[in-house]
Design a protein with these regions (language model features):
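Helical element adjacent to the flavin cofactor pocket in flavoenzyme catalytic cores
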Residues: 175-186
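Rossmann-like flavin
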Residues: 56-170
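Fold-independent oxyanion-binding glycine-rich loops
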Residues: 16, 158, 171-176
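Generic low-polarity alpha-helical segments
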Residues: 20, 43, 142, 172-175
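A short mid-domain helix/strand-loop element embedded in enzyme catalytic domains
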Residues: 28, 32, 169-175
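N-terminal glycine-rich phosphate/pyrophosphate-binding loop and immediately adjacent elements
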Residues: 1-101
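Short, contiguous strand/loop micro-motifs
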Residues: 19, 125-126, 186
Length: 186
């Protein structure tokens, strides 16, 4: 896959890439970022604002974030593909909100006390009906909304960049984390 690993002070770290904000903010959903924060370790973060994309349908430079990508969809594939993408994103947003509200390292689910459970439930309540989708393979959700080959290839690429696997073998929770950063690229 595309995971990164390194050793430091006797610890071994393995983490998939973060395509956008990743390690930069306190309270982020990057497991590596949270560990570094807990260990009070600072690492130099090099942000990039775009990347070159080589696809069967097109080759192009793309800035990070939702707006530049929406513009590129319209340019390359037209309004129908953009409508597909918007429907897909509308389905993914509640999953991304759920992921962004869940504590990754604070406690394990078995050890949540009553107050923590209540606080977590109130945060998740607006999107609770979507929680079951986090267990699905991401390809199942993507193919429900995306018929355009470019969009399917794009989501398959993003899945590979996160997990080293196809969208059908990638966990929806991992992709919801990526898309949470997609919605907030800075």
């Amino acid at each position: 896959g595309v995971a990164h690993s390194f050793s430091r002070n006797g610890y071994k770290f393995e983490s998939g890439p973060s395509l956008w904000s990743g390690l930069n903010s306190i309270g982020n959903n990057s497991p590596l970022g949270q560990i570094l924060f807990l260990l009070k370790e600072d690492v130099e973060i090099k942000k990039y604002m775009g990347w070159k994309v080589l696809f069967p349908e097109a080759q192009f430079d793309l800035e990070v974030g939702d707006i530049p990508f929406r513009q590129k969809i319209r340019e390359l594939r037209g309004d129908a593909a953009l409508e597909e993408w918007d429907s897909f994103i509308k389905e993914i947003q509640p999953l991304s909100r759920i992921i962004s509200r869940m504590p990754l390292l604070t406690t394990s689910p078995q050890n949540l006390n009553l107050l923590e459970s209540f606080n977590l439930l109130t945060k998740l309540l607006p999107d609770i009906k979507h929680v079951g989708n986090l267990r699905k393979d991401f390809g199942e959700i993507a193919e429900k909304y995306l018929k355009d080959s470019f969009l399917n290839n794009w989501v398959d690429l993003l899945s590979f960049l996160i997990s080293g696997m196809s969208m059908h073998d990638t966990n929806t929770a991992a992709m919801a984390t990526l898309f949470n950063e997609w919605f907030n690229p800075n």
